[in-house]
């Protein structure tokens, strides 16, 4: 793993070729190895700096936290906090990350004018937390990369003060693909007809304006580890 900024690998050793070694977690040709337990804190700090630098103009921040992804390496100050191993500690550290971003938005009085979405790109791996009696996917069948619900039904939390009703819920089935149309709608940008034709604007649903027809006619998922795919329409799912 390496740091990448503006499409460039950071910390390259002068004159050396970068090569993968071992189990692909380490590279040759890097001058300074990254401190794995500081990855989360570093990313959170850079996200805060980005907000500081753009506080006076509209901005889009995509923050793909690596906290609860392997390798599970929570910061030293989080070790043992959860009483549920590295996974639980990492979940708590992620919660701190989100709180830090919220605090930064409030610091610049941007919390009223910012659409914040927290979600995941896949379901959890169920082995994490199992020894502590915890089921990462709750009652859902399957796990990450599975065609079943545990593979792709994930939490989706959105906040836009004054626009999204507090404590509201929706039963609509949506996809991460819908972020494109939703972000453009929130920014007041018209999405060209040929761009992301399978992306749907979720803002009306999020704001409590119920639609006469579903947001999506159907949702298609493909399993990474098998040839299976599923088509979900309303309460029905064909595999």
Where are the model-predicted features located?
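Short glycine/proline-rich turn/loop motifs
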Residues: 22-32, 76-81, 159-164
């Amino acid at each position: 793993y390496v740091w990448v900024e503006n499409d460039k690998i950071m910390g390259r050793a002068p004159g050396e070729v970068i090569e993968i070694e071992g189990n692909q977690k380490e590279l040759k040709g890097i001058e300074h190895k990254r401190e794995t337990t500081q990855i989360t804190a570093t990313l959170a700090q850079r996200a805060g700096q980005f907000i500081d630098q753009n506080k006076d103009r509209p901005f889009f921040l995509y923050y793909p936290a690596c906290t609860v992804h392997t390798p599970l390496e929570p910061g030293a100050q989080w070790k043992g906090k959860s009483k549920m191993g590295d996974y639980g500690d990492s979940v708590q550290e992620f919660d701190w990350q989100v709180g830090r971003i919220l605090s930064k938005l409030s610091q610049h009085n941007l919390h009223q004018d910012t659409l914040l979405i927290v979600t995941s790109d896949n379901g959890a791996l169920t082995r994490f937390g199992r020894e502590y009696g915890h089921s990462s996917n709750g009652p859902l069948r399957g796990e990450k990369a599975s065609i079943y619900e545990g593979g792709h039904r994930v939490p989706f939390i959105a906040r836009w003060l004054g626009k999204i009703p507090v404590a509201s819920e929706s039963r609509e089935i949506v996809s991460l693909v819908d972020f494109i149309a939703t972000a453009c709608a929130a920014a007041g940008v018209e999405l060209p007809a040929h761009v992301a034709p399978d992306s749907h604007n979720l803002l009306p649903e999020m704001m409590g304006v119920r639609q006469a027809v579903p947001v999506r006619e159907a949702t298609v998922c493909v399993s990474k580890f098998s040839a299976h795919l599923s088509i979900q329409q309303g309460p029905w799912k064909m595999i």
